């Protein structure tokens, strides 16, 4: 993390270090003058400030940084030497170095970089959907074994999210993005050089495991940068990017596989693409985690003032094992006891299953029209058109939520987030019935392809609304809620990728798609139930926001 510290230290070059030095000297002089008697006025006044750190929000940093005595191991009010330590905080509510106070262009750039990482990684999840079948033929195994290449990627994605989401709260977002991305690049070499189908399956697992960081840390990055109103549009942009990757992947993979390059170039193209992304991340993407930035600030002040007493409390709480254990136990507890988490995880699982079943089902449906692998990828882009149409309505959703937010005098009501899902919940079963009963060879291929527009529209609104609602409902536990949601949706998606081909072969295209549509119909009431009774459900929950 030293290169991050160097960049961050440069940002702090404008600080009035003399003020920090003066503060250190003044407190030391007062302490020598007054002694260590905790009953003296100086200590009583300092304890009063410590107990109400927000009482001096209007002052500059030399008066707002709380002077606290701390034990490096026990967090008592005095350490073994009797010396005080000074906790580093943001200078005020408008500190320009705090991520929420950054210029809007910088926030948008950071969001776009995070979204681009998501496109690169998620494209890898589906780029091999055609190549897996051809590799299976080359290695003389069945097509279902070839589907394992996609399934193990998704299972690795699910497993990695459990590990890397809590680590981003310990070490910051940027180290996780940069380290996992470079490992992801290295494992592409293994995929391209695989000598048998089983080594390919294993490497695909590690592609997913180290590629999960964008989806694992996305909620944290967006929460770091944007207030609740701005988060409405930011999350829609990121969710659109999360779907663009899986939809663009089959187009790329189809044409690469059909060309003279062959299926191995799926991995070489990914390696080049992800490698360039890693360079962009390392040299242009800023750290957004507030506590990590305050750690850097404390480190910078210790170096520049030659005073080792500046600290941030987060520095002494870096316990990755505890963070992972807490995320696991909290996530399991939320999934087992919270109706909100159960319902919206079920919805997220359903759309992820649909997305990756489409990667198997669309080729089966459109091959009967004489499409080749590249043209089947283009057929899937109908879903992308729907996602972009849904994204184009972001200003309307933003205005709606802002009005509701202002009507409540700035108090967040999570149920206000559910408005887009009133439409999205109907779009998905309509699109599936449309696809299922127009995919006859006697019907023009454009008819089933157009159904993808409504499917994509529904995908976007379900993902964005579910994530927003979970964040607003669980606040401090939002990271755990999103972590368990990410795990369940990708684990289920990986399992269903294996059964999709037998399902379509045994039920035929029409009834297999209709079966999914009936499941979608069963999920339609969820947003309406929580819109009318969500507040009552939250008030009965020991973990959810009660407002």
UniProtKB/Swiss-Prot annotation:
<feature type="transmembrane region" description="Helical">
    <location>
        <begin position="265"/>
        <end position="285"/>
    </location>
</feature>
<dbReference type="GO" id="GO:0015171">
    <property type="term" value="F:amino acid transmembrane transporter activity"/>
</dbReference>
<feature type="transmembrane region" description="Helical">
    <location>
        <begin position="418"/>
        <end position="438"/>
    </location>
</feature>
<keyword id="KW-0813">Transport</keyword>
<feature type="transmembrane region" description="Helical">
    <location>
        <begin position="478"/>
        <end position="500"/>
    </location>
</feature>
<feature type="transmembrane region" description="Helical">
    <location>
        <begin position="197"/>
        <end position="217"/>
    </location>
</feature>
<keyword id="KW-1133">Transmembrane helix</keyword>
<feature type="transmembrane region" description="Helical">
    <location>
        <begin position="377"/>
        <end position="397"/>
    </location>
</feature>
<dbReference type="Pfam" id="PF07690">
    <property type="entry name" value="MFS_1"/>
</dbReference>
<feature type="transmembrane region" description="Helical">
    <location>
        <begin position="148"/>
        <end position="168"/>
    </location>
</feature>
<feature type="transmembrane region" description="Helical">
    <location>
        <begin position="514"/>
        <end position="534"/>
    </location>
</feature>
<feature type="transmembrane region" description="Helical">
    <location>
        <begin position="233"/>
        <end position="253"/>
    </location>
</feature>
<feature type="transmembrane region" description="Helical">
    <location>
        <begin position="108"/>
        <end position="128"/>
    </location>
</feature>
<feature type="compositionally biased region" description="Low complexity">
    <location>
        <begin position="62"/>
        <end position="75"/>
    </location>
</feature>
<feature type="transmembrane region" description="Helical">
    <location>
        <begin position="346"/>
        <end position="366"/>
    </location>
</feature>
<dbReference type="InterPro" id="IPR020846">
    <property type="entry name" value="MFS_dom"/>
</dbReference>
<dbReference type="InterPro" id="IPR011701">
    <property type="entry name" value="MFS"/>
</dbReference>
<dbReference type="GO" id="GO:0003333">
    <property type="term" value="P:amino acid transmembrane transport"/>
</dbReference>
<comment type="similarity">
    <text>Belongs to the major facilitator superfamily. CAR1 family.</text>
</comment>
<dbReference type="InterPro" id="IPR036259">
    <property type="entry name" value="MFS_trans_sf"/>
</dbReference>
<protein>
    <recommendedName>
        <fullName>Uncharacterized transporter C794.04c</fullName>
    </recommendedName>
</protein>
<feature type="transmembrane region" description="Helical">
    <location>
        <begin position="445"/>
        <end position="465"/>
    </location>
</feature>
<feature type="region of interest" description="Disordered">
    <location>
        <begin position="38"/>
        <end position="89"/>
    </location>
</feature>
<feature type="transmembrane region" description="Helical">
    <location>
        <begin position="174"/>
        <end position="194"/>
    </location>
</feature>
<feature type="compositionally biased region" description="Basic and acidic residues">
    <location>
        <begin position="38"/>
        <end position="50"/>
    </location>
</feature>
<dbReference type="GO" id="GO:0022857">
    <property type="term" value="F:transmembrane transporter activity"/>
</dbReference>
<dbReference type="GO" id="GO:0005886">
    <property type="term" value="C:plasma membrane"/>
</dbReference>
<keyword id="KW-0812">Transmembrane</keyword>
<dbReference type="GO" id="GO:0055085">
    <property type="term" value="P:transmembrane transport"/>
</dbReference>
<keyword id="KW-0472">Membrane</keyword>
